[in-house]
Amino acid sequence: MPDIALWSACDHRCVMCSNSFEYASTIRDYSFDSIKKRIDAYKDGNGFSMHRFPDVEWDWTITGGEPTLNPDYFKILSYLREQFPKSKLVQLTHGDNFADDDFSQKIATIENYHICVPLHGFNAETHEAIVRKKWAFQLLMRGILNILKHRKSGQSLEIRLIIQKMNIDYLDKMYYLIHKFFPTVDSISTIMMEFEWQAIDNLKNTHLSYTEVMKKNESVFLKWGEIFGERFRLYHFPLCVVKNKKLWPYMWRTLPAHEITFTKPCMDCKSWKYCMGIHEAYTEFNGNKEFSELEDISHSITPDSKNFRFHPIQSVM
């Protein structure tokens, strides 16, 4: 799965952003010609460094900064679609530009396009405290409505909740907002924050552990998992920290192998092949006391044989 950044700058200042401030100063490297060269190199077999998941060849993940800020954004998407007509384009975006109706209608012409937008709070105060941009919540709400209004067959929308200290107590309200105002969204993904760059710089406001998340939200996850069904997903959670087995079918692998680590208890775990792994920097800030080996669970689960790479557990018996 190639991973390509279209723009390094961003007009949000999220407290847990995985990019450094210095990264935003490399805008000169994101012209259409520069990006075209990278795409062409990949197609010619010289772009292995763009791979996030080397075993998934054709889907493209489009990142930034904020990629929709690139003046040549639609020109780049058109070129990607021309060169890879069967590939899914997975777009990571803060969603602000989708508040513009013309922009959203133009997006609706792109085939096989999956949009991922983050929701950080349940209202303007809680959301904008994290993104640090005034009116961002209003823009996101309008943007989501526009995406749902204009999307065509072959397009889908994923709303992502990135858990960190500043919103860990609001997840129930955030799920309720989605359920009430955006009931037709295709997937709702809850992601454990990665300890990288801005998240580390703002550790006082972002730090949390798996144990804290599950203590406060296990019942919340169970409740909304029942309501959302298969659309509900948990990302970046190791199996052993999620004690309630009813949640296991909602857990997905989304980190590439080079960003995953395992601790000493993992070495003796009889169910490691079903685990999502631990983000590589997590133990540096939380230690490894949360993790424990599991007995063999193969007799009590049904694997997802069609998508085991990303979704190892289909159901629990």
PLM features: what roles do these ranges have?
Residues 24-44, 67-112, 118-125, 133-139, ...:
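Canonical radical SAM enzyme core domain
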